[in-house]
Amino acid sequence: MELYSLTVHELKELLHKREVSAQEVTKSYLERIKEVEPKIDALVTITEEFALERAKVADEMIKNGEAKDLTGIPVIIKDNISTEGIRTTCSSKMLENYIPPYNATVVERLLNEGVVILGKSNLDEFAMGSSTENSAFKTTKNPWDLSRVPGGSSGGSAAAVAADEAAFALGSDTGGSIRQPASLCGVVGMKPTYGLVSRYGLVAFASSLDQIGPFTKDVTDCAIVLNAIAGHDPMDSTSVKIEKPDYTSYLKEDIKGLRIGVAKEFFGAGIEEGVKETVEKAIKVFEDLGAEIIDISVPYVEYALPAYYIIASAEASSNLARYDGIRYGHIAKNYEDLVDMYMTSRSEGFGKEVKRRIMLGTYALSSGYYDAYYKKALKVRTLIKNDFERAFEKCDVIVGPTSPTVAFKIGERTNDPLAMYLADIYTVSVNIAGLPAISIPCGLSEGLPVGLQIIGKHFDEGRILNVAYAFEKAYKFDAKPQAIGGER
């Protein structure tokens, strides 16, 4: 068994007992990256020297009896999360050479834990996309089948964890950007409640929807990482002051008698038969564990996708107005006057999908159309929130498929934005309502992973992790991606 194939909690045990050093663990992962990265293209930047320095710091912490849960554990950070002194590009030409002067709060918290940062992961440009094909630099491949996408926008982080390039990774989720790639790559991915994890240092896409969360190899690891990154931050005005529990303490609670809601709206048109069957079998596992399965309905979820794309694009058009080439970011070499400089810099710096969403958002916010689009989308948002509140009066969690399909072929949907947007049909409603949700692997369809989404009430991450852990223990998903080869 190679060190790089171990989980966070397995590595933690070995490190704390001093059976291996953080430097040995780090070298194992760096070798793994050299072996598989040319095949999957998950990383924008590899920070080898910094990683080895951090490993020495971790070994000192362990030697001095100061070890924490994540001391010496290697991580990869999505490249829209600020890392001081390390290039943060958002996979865009606009920020190709941007080096932040500060760390995001989540990065600061992880560094205080003693983690080892191995590099930054590829994403759809400015986190806009569902396949990681919109990156200005490279297309990340799915470790299960190199001709397929890993999902998006956090496809680099998901592929890196699936391929054992890191013990865990951070991503961001605006409409499914952690859960959908986790589903397509066969790993665990969690989007916490809006406000639980600080957004300070996350490059904004849609500020009322964005949330940072972890990708891990199992549910226990997810709870450990959430312990480290969750909690109030005065630097983020949307961060919520609540007492933070130890999320690992929920894992082993019995789920007998728990009410699990199944909404027919999450099994509608567009779902692949293989995905539907796999998820239905997964729901049967909960029944066997003594949980009560309850049919529920969330009717307004049907309108979640159009509402999401109006709200997210409107917020993006406002957030991305700051990239004008003056203070930082790409600046055009040839221009006639100030206005031409703005236009040319933005034209050259942004990719097609980003431009599409800026135009969509600007249109939705324009005076003649504000009421017809943006205002109406906000009303739908309220109706969706109310739907979930009513549903949670009858059940404790809601389960269903994370994605309507398994990983699709690279290039299959690039010329059909609507087909691409439909990849998020089961995930966007969770962001619209600000709820927490997790995707865990629940089987294979056509040899590719299928994700089960578990949605909870606001700040009920403990319950979600409990249900996910119970399933993981009962089902034991142990399939591994074969397309990348190597010792596992």
Swiss-Prot record:
Under InterPro entries, the record lists:
Amidase (IPR000120), Amidase_CS (IPR020556), Amidase_dom (IPR023631), AS_sf (IPR036928), GatA (IPR004412)
Protein name, as recorded: Glutamyl-tRNA(Gln) amidotransferase subunit A
Q: Which HAMAP family match?
A: GatA (MF_00120)
In the Enzyme Commission scheme, what number(s) does this protein have? 6.3.5.7
Q: Which NCBIfam families match?
A: gatA (TIGR00132)
Task: Please name the taxonomic classification of the source.
Answer: Bacteria, Bacillati, Bacillota, Clostridia, Thermoanaerobacterales
Q: Which Pfam families match?
A: Amidase
**Enzyme class label:** ligase
Query: Which residues are responsible for catalysis?
Result: 78 (charge relay system), 153 (charge relay system), 177 (acyl-ester intermediate)
Function noted in UniProt = Allows the formation of correctly charged Gln-tRNA(Gln) through the transamidation of misacylated Glu-tRNA(Gln) in organisms which lack glutaminyl-tRNA synthetase. The reaction takes place in the presence of glutamine and ATP through an activated gamma-phospho-Glu-tRNA(Gln).
Q: Which reaction does it catalyse?
A: L-glutamyl-tRNA(Gln) + L-glutamine + ATP + H2O = L-glutaminyl-tRNA(Gln) + L-glutamate + ADP + phosphate + H(+)
Q: Which GO terms describe its cellular component?
A: glutamyl-tRNA(Gln) amidotransferase complex
Q: Keyword annotations for this protein? A: ATP-binding, Ligase, Nucleotide-binding, Protein biosynthesis
Query: How does this chain assemble?
Result: Heterotrimer of A, B and C subunits.
What is a single molecular function from GO for this protein? ATP binding
A GO BP term here is: translation
Q: Identify its protein family.
A: Belongs to the amidase family. GatA subfamily.
